[in-house]
Regions:
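Extended hydrophobic leader/signal-anchor segments used for secretion and membrane insertion
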Residues: 1-82
Length: 82
């Protein structure tokens, strides 16, 4: 999530499943529920939320890899920065 977040940066998470495009979502990895991912919400799709990382061209897991994120996998979102 660089440039928004640096590797290892600690974050506050607002516990909610209410998202909108532009939010930064915190969710369980659909491929391994023990992992937690942080990605930007792009849009709502049938079956869930389309999320993407901020580094284009990188082969990091996002909805291009695992498809839309089921709303039940959402743990929350990061507070909006001013």
């Amino acid at each position: 999530m660089i440039p928004t977040l640096a590797p290892g940066e600690e974050v506050w998470v607002l516990r909610t499943r209410r998202l909108r495009p532009g939010d930064i979502a915190v969710f369980r990895d659909p491929r391994d529920r023990d992992l937690i991912l942080i990605k930007r919400v792009v849009r709502r799709e049938p079956g869930g939320w389309w999320v993407e990382g901020e580094i284009s061209g990188e082969h990091l897991p996002d909805s291009h890899t695992f498809g839309p994120v089921d709303p039940g996998m959402i743990l929350g979102r990061l507070p909006r920065r001013r």
